[in-house]
């Protein structure tokens, strides 16, 4: 039994390989399909696969590679459609696992060549991908289900899921772009330096304005007004003016008396 857990969506997949599985009995896939409505409660699903290539495995493979989208459950569905929906659930979980790895390793590079390398690495490291890859590489399959065709199909589906989940931030690493973070830090440092230079230049301009203005005496004597001294100055000016007028009058009188 192989068990793989996807922590992001809580899906647990169990793969059982049994040699004594009788195809005449009820298929375990039927049991999975009967729990279609309970899937969102994060139940465990058991998938029984015969190690030998059989018609059931071929149907499972074709449904796995061709039926990518979910079908909402309706009443009066035949068991074959239930089987298809059960396989779609497995396929969706597998695709999410691929997208999570791609988003961590290379968030913006969904290139076919890079995806092919990632798929080959996952085939050796991941149990789910390895099982599907071994089924795909068997000689009894049709040419339309070769590994290159499957990779292209999975690439398209991964790209679709990536665009759907881009805004939801469902997978770790999608929005973590080192180049973008570095550019943000550089812009922040540049803004800080510019603000610092602006503040220093504004302080320098203020100091120049203060130096160019006339000095102001801040002593207490300069700020107080001496009323007595001002009155003495006014009186002295008035006295001088009176003396001048009197002296001029005396001069005129002297001239008149002399004329007499």
Curated annotation (Swiss-Prot):
Give the Low complexity compositional bias ranges: 199-213
According to its record, what are the GO cellular component terms? mitochondrion; nucleus
Report TM segments: none
Q: What are the alphabetically sorted keywords of the record?
A: Meiosis
- Give the GO terms filed under biological process for this record: meiotic DNA double-strand break formation; reciprocal meiotic recombination
Q: Where is this region: Disordered?
A: 197-222
Other observations noted: Despite weak sequence similarities, may correspond to the subunit B of a rec12-containing topoisomerase 6 complex specifically required for meiotic recombination. Retains some of the structural features of the ancestral archaeal Top6B subunit (AC O05207).
Q: How does it assemble?
A: Component of the DSB catalytic core (DSBC) complex, composed of at least rec12, rec6 and rec14. The complex interacts with mde2.
Q: What does this protein do?
A: Required for formation of the rec12-mediated double-strand breaks (DSBs) that initiate meiotic recombination. May be involved primarily in the early steps of meiotic recombination.
Q: Which family does it belong to?
A: Belongs to the TOP6B-like family.
Q: What is this protein called?
A: Meiotic recombination protein rec6
